Amino acid sequence: MKHGLLQRMFMLCVGMFLMQALSAQEYKFEVGGMAGGAFYMGDANKNSPFKGLNPAAGAVFRYNINFRWALKANLMWGQISGKTDGANAFPNGGQTDFSRSLLELGGQAEFNFFPYSDKFDYTGAKRFTPYLLVGLGMTVAPGGDASFVSPNIPLGMGVKYKLRPRLNLGCEFSVRKTLGDGLEGKDMLNDPYGISSSALKNKDWYSFLLLSVTYDFGERCRTCNNAKHIEY
């Protein structure tokens, strides 16, 4: 009787220890999806952010270096559009509009304002944090009068929230500065005023406003539950 009771108590203690160790486990990687809207700023939309908001979606992979820093890769699809009316005046009263899809492959570095985790409260870690991002990407927009291919520089900010262990929600706004002209896919908009300029002075930008859901995987430390193995 006593032997059976001691055995059950021992198994219960082992089970509780394992559950605690698993609940404190941190993960190195995230994978998931993003969806929201995209809009264009350029010769066919100079002054109205969020005008012509179109659908956007993509996949995201994140490597969490520590609680403060992460590296992110994304593959995005978005629809952009613009129209040369109203404040967008052109020589000789010229008017045009466009709508086209684009694909983007990019990578960014992210900095979390707070150490990001739903565990290890003694380190000051929080399950919610704002963050900043900067990176480099490549944009491809087929079709139109001419296909468009250009590097881009993404800049942005967002927030992350650890909804539950291994499940993250996010909201992100970012702008992309393209290093080539002709994102609209219309010859008329490549140089509407007949004035040549460098790639750094072109007016073709696009932006994403996205919601994301990601799932953690890749255990950071499989065999221990020791604070010295947790980077923050």
Put a short name on every predicted segment.
Residues A24-R62, F208-C221, Y232:
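Short glycine/proline- and aromatic-enriched beta-strand/turn motifs that initiate or cap beta-hairpins
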Residues Y27, K51-P55, S101-L105, K126-F128, ...:
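Residues that define the transmembrane beta-barrel architecture of outer-membrane proteins
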Residues F29, R68-L71, S117, P165-L169, ...:
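Repeated loop/turn-to-beta-strand initiation elements of outer-membrane beta-barrel proteins
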Residues E30-G32, A70-K72, Y131-L133, N168-G170, ...:
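Residue-level detector of the transmembrane beta-barrel scaffold of outer-membrane proteins
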Residues G33-G37, A59-Y63, G107-F111, V134-M138, ...:
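Residues on the lipid-exposed face of transmembrane beta-strands in outer-membrane beta-barrel proteins
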Residues A44-S48, I80-A89, G93-S101, V140-F148, ...:
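Extracellular/periplasm-exposed beta-strand and loop segments of Gram-negative cell-envelope proteins
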Residues F67-G144:
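Gram-negative (and chloroplast) outer-membrane scaffold detector with strong preference
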Residues T84, R164-Y232:
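Predominantly the C-terminal beta-signal and adjacent terminal strand-loop region
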